[in-house]
Structures are given as C-alpha cells and as structure tokens.
Amino acid sequence: MIRWLAAFFCSLIFAGVAPAKPAFEIREKITYSTVGDRALLLDAFIPNAAGTHPAVLVVHGGAWRSGNRRQLRAYATALAERGFVCFAIDYRLAPKHKFPAQIEDCRMAVRWIRKNASHYKVNPDRLGAIGYSAGGHLVSLLATTGKPPSDTNGNIDTRIQVAAAGGAPTDFRWFPDNGRWAEFWMGGDLTSKKELFLAASTAAFVDAGDAPLFFFNGSADELVPEAWTKACYFALKSAGVKTEFYSIANAGHMQAAMDPGALEKACDFLASVLVPEHKTAGSGENAVSAQGDPSADSSSDSAISKDLDHECFVGKPVG
C-alpha cells in the first residue's frame, strides 16, 4: 500500500512535466557528392534555435580503410548541443580508393556545406572540423591545405577556420621500413610514392596563414605516439599559428578517442574561433595541458621535440 501511494504521488508531481525538447534535429543519409556510382553520405545535426550557426565537419577514423559517419556521433552530439551545426561524413576508403581520395571527399563536403548553408542554418564563414585518428589527420590537412576560390564562376572556398585533431598522424615523410605499411593506402612505398607521402603530410604545409589547430593525444598511444602528432604542433607554433596540445595521461589510442576532458577542450577550442564572444577560463594561444593541468606538461615540449628524431621518424626523409 505504501509503495502504491508513493508511486501515485510521484505521478502527480511529474504529470505536468513535459519531456525536454531536443536541442537539435538529425537528418540522415544526405548525399553530398557522387563519385562514379557511389553516393557519399552525411548526417546533419541541426540546432533547433533560430538564426544561423557555425558549422563543424565531423570526420571518422579507421586507418583510412574502415569506419563510417556514425562512428563519432558523440562528437557531433556534443557540438550540436552547444549550438553548432554538425555534418558527419562518409568518405571513400582504401585499399579500393587510394590517397588523395579521402581528402578530396572532405573538400567536397566543405564545398557542399557552403553551397547549401541556407538550407541548414549555417553561417558559411564560420566552418570548422573535428576528427580522430585517420579523421584527425584529414581535418588537420584541411586546416593547412584548404584553397580559396580560383575564379568567380561558382568555385567554392574549401578553407576551414579551425580544426580539432585527435590521435592524428601528421608527417609521413620519415619511416623506418620505407613506408611499406602504407602501401594499401598510397599504392606504393615511400621511395616509389614520395610525392603522395609528402602530399599527405600536414606538417609539410604549415605556414602562418593556416587555420588554428587543436591536438589531443593519449600519452600511452602506441599506434599514434604523441611525437607523431607533435611534429605538426611544433611547426604551427613556430609559424605563429594558434595551436594547443592536450595530452591525456596514460591513455591509449582508443581510450583517448572518447576522453570527456579532451572532447570538452576540443569543443572549447572550436568555439574560441567560430564563436568570437566565447570565453573559457585559462584559454590562450599555444597552451599545452595534460588532464586539465597546464603545469603537468610544462617540460614535455622539449622532451618530445627531442623524440621526433628517433621515436617515430627513424630514417631519413625522402625527397
């Protein structure tokens, strides 16, 4: 009897409480490009709030040969809840599709977003990207190699304003086995395909005009060690580009992908560029932090910079 009365009174208390309205809607399986007979799809996460919003391209990982647009739904959801329009994309995968197919698809997605901005409440001048692992590599490459329109006949700008790259390899010019591990993706080793390895190397394209870049990486990541990501971080820092590196203590490659602290920092960094009025405590250019403690990584820059010559990049650059 007591249990029944408790349930009855609870029902009275909550009877007038309507379910919370979702902060955004999801539109799935939208074709952003067709290559041959293959339709490339995306899912759009659109805030319900009125007006236009900054947009973020979400690019999945999977070693450039697996994965799909649903893989980083947690990233898209977190950003959409903050008021960003998010577009999570599929792209062509190796070994059937060799590089540069993957980055070409990312650029096609950027063009599509800008072309269709008015249909998705997007401010086309505020476009960023986030990705992890292979996706982190691709968004970092977007940030350093985007191109302005080459003419006035409808060509659309592929430059983005900011990127957040997690677990991202950024330099493919140095490898101990001559890059044979990447033959499935490049179509050859470092000697035979040196131009492609160079074209895939984010760090090789860094200059002062690049978009700001936020990196996050697990300190125990053996698949993509921090030194591999730091190659680009140091290059950007030297060029005077706004950049941050967030180290996730004791995290491996998969653990770092869903670290809530890293995702929050990435969202904050994207907002700091795409939403000019956005402010976060302790934010600033070229900040390095580990588990939210800036002092925890105060000596790591010099230590990891020394590792660049022997931990990940054993051998000599080709070309």
Where are the regions that the model predicts?
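A fold-wide structural signal in alpha/beta-hydrolase
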Residues: A55, A80-F87, R92
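N-terminal cap/lid segment of alpha/beta-hydrolase-fold proteins
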Residues: K21-A50
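Mobile cap/lid helix-loop segments that gate and shape the active-site cleft of serine hydrolases
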Residues: V35, R173-F205, A211
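Primarily recognizes the serine-hydrolase "nucleophile elbow" in alpha/beta-hydrolase
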Residues: R111-D177
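Catalytic nucleophile-loop/oxyanion-hole region of alpha/beta-hydrolase
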Residues: G67-R69, Y75, F87-P124, A256-A262
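C-terminal catalytic histidine-bearing segment of alpha/beta-hydrolase fold enzymes
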Residues: D43, F216, A227-G292, D301-G315, ...
